[in-house]
């Protein structure tokens, strides 16, 4: 399978690199400069997956979670490392004169994986229910995809004052550390909103639910801003809105398929929540990475990708069982197969796109050319 078209291979060497307009408070005033780059970021991604499995196996209780508190602390530390590496890897690449379209793709690819995994980690740490974790997953992935869709038109990845790569990750670090120190009980504190609204609204909610609700609102507001900016830019570029709005079709198919699947068989998600979200994360990352490749190579957007076939197949399998009472394949097996297939697609894409880009750009992956100037050591 070839991921770059002949047209893309011609355009790829001429790619000048997109720019990131990061208004983040953390990025401008707090984040330090270091020597590390994508390797530790990739390590953090694999740790995130391991964290989810370790927590899922321990199954701590609200009354006694002392046996796994160290995992929450370790999670916070690894999110911090990932955040630092993600913020400085571009600086390190420019410093060593190894900036390339492949490095940009690798950076955003790691981000796409962590965008799906981070809500799962924080949700487990804060004791959020499975359905709320899924809502948080959707709330995180929608603005992320739309931000890269917007970049296709503007050639700028715009990150607002409160954004995922920094502020949201800092909040995740804080939440994990608080859980590790005090335990999950702190997130189940009841808040009486009738006091804040002069008794006009009678509502009492848990702290963790209120936090996730606020984060979801911020995500959807950000997504709306992405759509508005992309629409204005498409009009300025004289691109028909039909063409512009058809480009997110793969993500819309992904989103709608998942919603229908959960509507048909909610118990299936509750039985395998971690495997389910990991499968969705791999498919989401695949779709986003293909979008980035098309932007870098100045190719036309594709409206469908092969991993979506298997997601749709799982939905149809469940629909046949619910409406026709025909069990083509056991639902639990279908979830596990989707996980294996989506992971396989992600591995194949990663290996193949590295080979293709290295061949076109005449570079070696994860190496600093000998012709590059030596790096000065920090005192």
Swiss-Prot record:
Keywords: Membrane, Transferase, Transmembrane, Transmembrane helix
Record membrane topology: Multi-pass membrane protein
Compartment(s) of residence: Membrane
Membrane-spanning residues: 30-50, 70-90, 117-137, 142-162, 171-191, 210-230, 241-261, 268-288, 308-328, 333-353
InterPro entries reported in the protein's UniProt record: CDP-OH_P_trans, CDP-OH_PTrfase_TM_dom, CDP_ALCOHOL_P_TRANSF_CS, CHOPT
Family, as annotated: Belongs to the CDP-alcohol phosphatidyltransferase class-I family.
Name assigned to this protein: Uncharacterized CDP-alcohol phosphatidyltransferase class-I family protein 4
Source organism: Dictyostelium discoideum (Social amoeba)
């Amino acid at each position: 399978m070839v991921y770059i078209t002949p047209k893309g291979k011609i355009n790829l060497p001429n790619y000048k690199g997109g720019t990131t307009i990061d208004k983040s408070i953390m990025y401008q005033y707090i984040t330090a400069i270091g020597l590390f780059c994508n390797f530790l970021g990739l390590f953090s991604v694999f740790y995130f997956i391991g964290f989810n499995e370790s927590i899922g196996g321990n199954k701590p209780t609200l009354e006694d979670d002392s046996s796994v508190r160290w995992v929450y602390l370790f999670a916070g530390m690894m999110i911090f490392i990932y955040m630092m590496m993600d913020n400085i890897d571009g600086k390190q690449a420019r410093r060593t004169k190894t900036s390339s379209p492949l490095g940009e793709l690798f950076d955003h690819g790691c981000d796409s994986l962590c965008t799906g995994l981070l809500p799962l980690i924080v949700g487990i740490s804060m004791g959020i229910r499975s359905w709320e974790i899924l809502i948080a997953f959707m709330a995180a992935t929608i603005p992320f995809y739309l931000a890269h869709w917007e970049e296709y038109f503007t050639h700028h990845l715009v990150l607002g004052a409160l954004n995922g790569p920094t502020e949201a990750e800092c909040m995740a670090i804080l939440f994990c550390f608080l859980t590790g120190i005090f335990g999950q009980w702190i997130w189940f504190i009841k808040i009486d909103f009738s006091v804040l609204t002069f008794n006009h609204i009678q509502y009492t909610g848990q702290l963790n639910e209120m936090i996730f609700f606020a984060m979801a609102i911020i995500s959807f507001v950000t997504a709306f801003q992405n759509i508005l900016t992309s629409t204005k830019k498409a009009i300025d570029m004289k691109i028909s809105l039909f063409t512009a709005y058809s480009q997110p079709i793969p993500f819309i198919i992904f989103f709608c398929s998942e919603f229908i699947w959960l509507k048909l068989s909610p118990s299936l998600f509750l039985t395998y929540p971690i495997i389910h979200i990991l499968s969705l994360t791999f498919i989401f990352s695949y779709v986003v990475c293909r979008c980035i490749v098309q932007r870098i190579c100045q190719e036309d957007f594709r409206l469908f990708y092969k991993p979506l076939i298997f997601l749709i197949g799982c939905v149809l399998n469940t629909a046949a069982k619910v409406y026709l009472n025909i069990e083509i394949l056991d639902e639990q097996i279908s979830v596990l197969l989707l996980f294996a297939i989506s992971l396989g697609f992600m591995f194949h894409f990663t290996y193949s796109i590295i080979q293709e880009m290295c061949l076109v750009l005449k570079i070696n992956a994860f190496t600093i050319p000998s012709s590059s100037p030596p790096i000065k050591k920090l005192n």
